[in-house]
Amino acid sequence: MLRFVVRSVLLMTVVMACRLADAQIDTVAADPVGAAPGFKAVSEKELNAAAGRLRESLGPLRQLLDRSKSGAGWREYLDWKELERQAASGTKADVETLVRLYRKFDSGENGLEMPQFSAVKRAVGSYLEAAGTAGNPDAEKVYKGRLERLAAAVKEAAASGTPQSLEVVGPTLARLEESGQAPQVVARLRKALGMPNLLLQVDEDLVGRSVNRVVDETAPINEMLLGARVCGTGHTTGLVLLDFQPSADRAVVDLVLTATNHSQTRGTKGPVTVHTLGTATVDARKRVFIDEKAVTSAPVDVNASVATKTQGISVNKKLGAKLIRKIASKKIAQMQPQARAISEQRARQRVRSQFESQTAEPIRKAASDYQTKFRQKLLERGWFPEMLSINSDADRIFVTARKSLPDQVAAFTTAPEVAPAAVLSARLHQSFFNNLAEQELAGRTLTKEELESQMEKAGRKMPESLESEADQPPWSITFAKRKPVELAVSDGTVKLTVRGSRYTSGDREFDAMDVWATYKVESDAGKFRLVRDGDVQIYPPDFVPGGDRKLSVQQTSLRGILQKRFNKVFDEVIDIKPLELPGELKSAGPLPMEQLVARKDGWIVAGWRQAEAPKSETASLAAVEP
């Protein structure tokens, strides 16, 4: 059960609800670069540091190539020996050689999107920028131009309230940082334009509906107490409840047992049998911690109290029975505090042992899954957020994340509020999606066969919209290096663009083409849907429909092929169905959508309300007897 709690939290995931950074674009709009310092020549120390970062980045890639069957081929392709020579060059880097090496990493060959390759690519680029700036007589002019572009882009974004003009900001900040220029300006703008771009929250009520249980069990009692054999029955009633705890630096989840055991026993020692009514109350708590690194737990904490009432004393002996009963009654009164203390201690030990045994394996499994299925998997693919914070209050668990590499920006405004009735919500800024898409797809070639293989590994079927028809040959797409797949959010609309720098259909090759569709967010009688605004648009990059420029015969042919396929990919109407929940959470769903908001600053907010309450279930727990 506890494993379910932890997994549920992770599935909905991982946040500081809403203790967001104070910085946002309004704080820098009036004077984006401030009193920027003058140009500073790149020092030997900075060149050596850039070379050191390149050497450091080679380690993980070297390990990857050592264990890869294609490692030798990659080393030859990347000119590994020259790469190592340049990494050891310090202040004597060869700019032309670094340019050549960088182009190899930026060629779009499949596999180069892996994080080990990407890290070296960034390190080569950083070293190249530092060395190029050091040897460029026009470096000061370039520096001033960058500051001007930054100021113009930030002012435009602040004035329009949209992120479109910020496209140049991420790469420009990265180049300034790599060449050691204007560190205060870089830090200031990174803070303003690097706010969290993914916020998730889940209510205790939602998870609790699949966790909370009624305890109702009758069990036999048979034990020794102060030399007497005690037998009888105990009836335990109570609740097992999920209880979120306030915590600023991690999520804290308690699984709490609150129960009362009413027992009726007879204790026999020699000729005397004592009939007793007992009441034991128990409060047990198993605490689990979840942060960005691991799932851990504390030992079970148990409180127990016992009260007894002697119902009667019988003596299995006629001779002297009255005297024996009198002595026994006095002895019982004297021993009652000791008996109560022993009973309370046994109750604590019993419940502690039981709770630990019930939760040990689920917690171990949850901790293992957190590492292997969440953290490690994201790290291996380079998807782990650059900032991830998990925390809780008395009612919710929050996950706050920011995904943005050094040459990318994130959100520049705070996220919209979540609807009060939402028990599960996700607030996604377009930068989260776009940054991840660029990291994963930029320059990559995807074939139908490769997509089929990936879908099969994931245990999914190929979407019909991406299947080649009987009369159509296999296809491939090479994604653009910049914004290969882009999400653009405006007030009440969502636009998705796919940019291909090259397409193939069988043996035929086609040049670059952009494909996009715009959807309106509509709601009616509490139901939400996305309605496509017109046809799917397919044009070459920078082509203006209705302008003087005309499509070539080849472009018209490709447009027809893509139109046929993408009209199936981008449905005219997408009805938002109630959300089916995974695993043990399934019984708490499906959740009807409560909120779907698209805002021009790039934010999408989706919230789901509680489903109708399921019938109560009963769980058993061994009786806690005095």
Where are the regions that the model predicts?
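Short acidic, glycine/tyrosine-flanked loop/strand segments centered on an H-E-D-like triad
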Residues: A298-I332
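Short beta-strand/helix segments in adaptor/scaffold domains that form protein-protein interfaces
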Residues: G227-A228, G232-L241, Q245, K293, ...
